Regions:
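N-terminal maturation segment of proteins
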Residues: 24-614
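N-terminal export signals
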Residues: 6-25
């Protein structure tokens, strides 16, 4: 049951803007009380921008559960990944940005003005990105990359998992839509092909070690696709479960073999060609216009004007503070000799904190996660006044995706609740996880991290549910780890506490390594060694991590920048309110205000302070 504090009434009205037609989850938020012409005009503007967004991102409509009614045709479509398609998106972004910038927000309530400000910020960042000479630019999301197809980017990774996990099959029409999307998938692959060929013509070639990893994955994907693979298995299994008669498997197999596999082969051939001229230079400094791309990517990730030098120095300072805390705890549990990194490496070899190998260990990991999720759910009333109950599930990443994937990731489900929030865990080897680090990872990806935070957006305007800012999303997830600690997750577990601190220090390392690679000409090996030597991180994990920084420049910097800013705002609110400060009310402010850039987050905290003072 929702029980909002009166002090948050102004911020809670973020949830009062009406959902777009077709957003099915019932809201328990109070009805809107603002009915001025300016408010109505703002709602109309936000609705229209949201509809424009979905026209170019039909997958999002399905994932949110709003591909019904007037939007039903979107269920049969995939986004256009060709150069022409990207140009159309860029043109729409520029048009909608001008409308948002021209809108007079002076007469709006705080929540409605915030929504317009969020659109302005997200669309300005995207417009600036589209002005760059290359790259895969997102609108209000976290995955911006110079490389359209690489080890962790591309339709060959996104679409098979998406079709199996998010595309519903409840009736024959859904199965037909699935087949239509299979055909669109082949077109997506060729659209991407044209873009990576054009990028090569501009001198943009990914690092050789990324191409090698991508080619390994793509060859396996093409091999599986020629015989049908998961694309066929998914529709066969689900139509059978729903007793939907038809030759679905045979039709899917024909599309896979005749259209998708050849398109994959064409991408493979292009990357093989690029591999011949590729070097091991890891950073954007070695690419044409790379410094410009990195400056933009860093701004998009952090929503600040911090320079690479600023970010690098911040990471080094944060590491000193975190390692001082770790040093004290490590000494208390018998690890007194050597640097913090050396002691954490020794701790990782301690068999008491390891999971078993193979399937036995995988089962242990899933049981461990289940235990921690149950515990944290029970603690939520101690952290929030406004309660939600996320529908979530834990799933193993598809094995073919695991080599190029991080240890885990998570996100909220659909508006109507039919698609649960998912916590995807990489189980290619149990050595990726330890008993002192997995709880913290779980709190980050699921509850009270990404999955819980996403649940609070479900009554916001649709465009607000589509737009996200990396510094907020990941800053919140790190803050969620901190909340779990403050709620007692490690009260009787000092080794778990040091694992939590190591995870936060890991994000501080990212500030140093990401900027080191892209602005200070570090090699891939330097990045890996920094994590291992300084923080005692798992070499197997950080090799993939550093590869990720090479393909997603700047993205890794949003985590700690966002987390530190949230804590700065928390201390500001505490100082301003004194005895009136309530951490649960502050936490409500963060989640009810929605996903915002950091300057807007500060405005939301201003509003909370004003309301709490009365």
């Amino acid at each position: 049951m929702m029980n909002r504090r009166e002090a948050l009434a102004a911020l809670a009205s973020t949830a009062a803007l009406p959902l777009l037609h077709g957003c099915g989850r019932e809201s328990t938020a109070p009805a809107a009380t603002t009915t001025s012409p300016a408010h109505a005009d703002a709602v109309k503007l936000l609705d229209e921008i949201g509809e424009n967004y979905l026209r170019f991102a039909p997958e999002s409509a399905t994932s949110l559960g709003v591909d019904t009614g007037d939007r039903a045709a979107l269920r049969s479509q995939l986004a256009d990944r060709s150069a022409e398609g990207q140009q159309k998106i860029a043109a729409q972004v520029r048009q909608d940005l001008e409308r948002a910038k021209a809108f007079d927000t002076a007469g709006l309530d705080h929540a409605t003005r915030t929504s317009v400000d969020v659109v302005r910020s997200a669309y300005q960042l995207a417009a600036d990105g589209f002005a760059l000479p290359y790259g895969d630019i997102t609108v209000g999301s976290w995955r911006n990359t110079p490389y359209v197809v690489i080890q962790n980017v591309g339709a060959y990774l996104d679409v098979p998992r998406y079709l199996d996990s998010d595309h519903p099959i409840e009736a024959a029409a859904d199965a037909e839509a699935y087949l239509a999307r299979l055909q669109s998938y082949a077109r997506q692959l060729d659209g991407e092909l044209g873009r990576i060929q054009a990028a090569r013509g501009k001198g943009l070639v990914p690092p050789a070690f990324l191409i090698d990893k991508a080619l390994s994955q793509m060859r396996q994907s093409a091999k599986n696709t020629r015989s049908g693979g998961s694309l066929v298995e998914s529709i066969e299994r689900r139509t059978k479960a729903k007793s939907i008669a038809g030759d679905w498997g045979a039709r899917a197999r024909a599309i896979a073999a005749k259209e998708i596999a050849p398109a994959l082969d064409r991408q493979i051939a292009e990357l093989e060609l690029q591999r011949k001229s590729a070097t091991d230079d890891a950073g954007m400094w070695a690419r044409p216009n790379g410094d410009d791309f990195y400056r933009w990517a860093l701004k998009a990730s952090t929503t600040t004007d911090m320079t690479p030098d600023d970010v690098h120095a911040m990471g080094q300072e944060e590491l000193k503070q975190l390692h001082a805390q770790m040093d004290t705890i490590l000494k208390s549990v018998g690890y007194a000799s050597g640097s913090v990194g050396e002691r954490m490496t020794a701790l990782a070899r301690d068999k008491r904190y390891q999971f078993s190998e193979g399937d036995k260990g995988r089962a242990e990991i899933l049981a461990f996660i289940d235990e921690k999720v149950k515990w944290i759910r029970a603690q939520l009333p101690r952290a929030f006044n406004t309660q939600v109950n996320p529908n979530m599930e834990v799933k193993r990443l598809p094995p073919e995706e695991e080599p190029g994937a991080p240890t885990a990731y998570g996100g909220a489900g659909s508006i109507d609740g039919k698609i649960p929030g998912r916590y995807w865990i990489n189980l290619r080897t149990t050595e990726l996880h330890s008993r002192y680090s997995l709880a913290d990872l779980t709190f980050h990806e699921s509850i009270p991290g990404h999955i819980l935070q996403g649940e609070y957006t479900r009554t916001a305007p649709l465009i607000r549910q589509l737009l996200a800012f990396n510094a907020y999303s990941e800053g919140w997830a790190l803050y969620a780890q901190q909340l779990a600690d403050e709620l007692g997750a490690y009260a009787d577990d000092p080794v778990g506490k040091v694992g939590y601190l190591q995870a936060i220090a890991f994000r501080a390392c990212r500030l140093v390594v990401d900027t080191g690679i892209h602005a200070k000409r570090w090699t891939r090996e330097q990045g890996v060694r920094f994590f291992v030597d300084v923080n005692g991180s798992n070499p197997m994990e950080v090799a993939s991590e550093v590869d990720r920084y090479c393909s997603w420049p700047g993205q890794a910097c949003g985590y700690k920048v966002g987390h530190s800013e949230i804590n700065r705002q928390r201390e500001r609110a505490r100082a301003a309110l004194g005895q009136r400060y309530d951490v649960k009310a502050f936490n409500d402010t963060l989640v009810l205000g929605g996903n915002v850039p950091l300057d807007v987050l500060a405005n939301n905290v201003d509003e909370y302070i004003r309301a709490a003072k009365g």
